[in-house]
A protein has these predicted regions:
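RNase H-like nuclease fold core
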Residues: 84-169, 176-181, 188
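Residues immediately flanking
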Residues: 32, 109, 135, 174, ...
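Short alpha-helix plus adjacent loop in nuclease-associated cores
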Residues: 198-219
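Short small-residue beta-strand/loop micro-motif enriched in glycine and branched aliphatics
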Residues: 38-40, 138-142, 316-317
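Acidic/histidine-rich catalytic cores and adjacent linkers
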Residues: 126, 162-187, 196-199, 219-375
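Short, positively charged, Gly/Tyr-enriched micro-motifs
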Residues: 2-105, 109-116, 165
């Protein structure tokens, strides 16, 4: 024995009393490392040797329902130590995690960092995380760093060729990198563009046309500001969702501006297109929207509709009638998680927390492999 030192290790409370395990820990010569090392004690936490492993598992369980800060206050443990312990347990759970077999997945990015945290060798794409969700269970099955093509490539490489063959449908937004990754690894899968993002891009084109009309005919000096930016949401809202005042507003503008009348009919027609029961019916309605845009000389809408004409990603929606709405719900949960912790600096830890809160990396699911392994 080279030396020994006194250790006071925190343990789980007993009858609301703090429990501390006190013992001597020896230091001996290690033939493998060729230096003096402290003896290995398997019931101590490797990242925080002043805590027992049982206490670490308990901290991880508590962090499933509240923030690390609140857990540290509840257990009277340093916040940084609580964070390190929680990350260690999550990484240990990740070692035994197996991505489940999936056939329908939703892929979406979530904003993880602000531009202030962007490093010199990074681009804006690196500020995001790519979140993959199973449509059947509505659970997050994987989280990758950035929103590049390589982020989704990592997931497909992990599940292997056999797993890629099982995937039938992938829903995502119009991000080019995701589409290229799906085409490379899952050529037999149908890529479906999300309806929400399609409507969002349509609204942007529609708003640009409103701006043109405002620049051409708007006259705030005479009180004629019905086309002003403060009323832009009236022009983007469906007719059935407008208030009585909004309906009067749009009727007043349509009586004076023929192009706005065209745009109103185009907007309502475009929204109705998603209710079509067949691809041919939807194509006919999109062609009508395109023709009306040409007649109205709405160049932004013409360009937008033309870009959709031959895209199978759009027409696959009418084949499967599926969207990435589940990912939007998950994104709301992720934003709540981020808000609860006042943000994350460690993106690896953030990804693990997403899989803990919204996926299978928690005590309810992920511990089964550990118990089975030890019995």
């Amino acid at each position: 024995m080279h030396d020994r030192y006194w250790v006071r290790a925190r343990h789980l409370k007993a009858f609301n009393w703090n429990v501390v395990v006190c013992f001597y820990r020896e230091k001996r010569w290690c033939e493998s490392c060729k230096k003096v090392r402290s003896e290995w004690i398997d019931w101590l936490c490797p990242t925080s040797p002043h805590m027992t492993l049982e206490l670490c598992w308990w901290i991880n369980r508590l962090s499933e329902i509240t923030s690390v800060l609140q857990v540290s206050k509840l257990e009277s443990i340093d916040k940084m130590a609580t964070y390190k312990v929680d990350k260690h347990i999550l990484q240990r759970l990740l070692q035994g995690y197996k991505i489940p077999n999936v056939t329908h997945i939703s892929v979406d990015e979530v904003y993880a960092r602000s531009p202030v945290q962007q490093k010199e060798n990074e681009t804006r794409d690196d500020l995001f995380l790519t979140v993959i969700v199973d449509h059947r269970t509505h659970k997050v099955i994987w989280v990758s760093q950035s929103r590049r093509k390589e982020a989704l490539d990592t997931f497909f490489e992990m599940i292997g060729p056999e797993g890629c063959k099982q995937i039938k449908v992938v829903t995502c937004d119009q991000h080019r990198g995701y589409g290229e990754s799906v085409a490379q690894y899952c050529p037999g899968a149908d890529l479906v563009w999300d309806r929400f993002h399609l409507v969002q891009n349509f609204n942007e084109a529609l708003n640009e046309e409103r701006k043109k009309e405002w620049d051409k005919y708007g006259n705030p000096a005479d009180g004629d500001d019905l086309l002003a930016a403060k009323y832009r949401y009236i022009y983007l809202t469906k007719s059935k969702n407008r208030s009585a005042l909004d309906k009067w507003h749009i009727k007043e503008v349509m009586s004076k501006n023929e192009k706005i009348s065209y745009m109103e009919f185009i907007k309502e027609h475009f929204h109705k297109m998603f209710d079509c029961t067949s691809e041919n019916e939807a194509k006919e309605m999109l062609n009508e929207c395109y023709e009306w845009s040409v007649q109205a000389k709405a160049s932004n809408l013409v360009k937008y509709f033309w870009s959709l004409m031959e895209r199978n990603e759009l027409w696959n929606y009418f084949k499967h009638k599926i969207t990435s709405g589940v990912s939007e719900g998950i994104n709301r949960a992720i934003k709540t998680l981020k808000w609860q912790a006042y943000g994350y600096k460690d993106m690896v830890y953030f990804a693990l927390k997403i899989m803990q809160k919204c996926g299978y990396l928690n005590s309810r699911y992920a511990l089964s492999w550990l118990y089975n392994e030890n019995t």
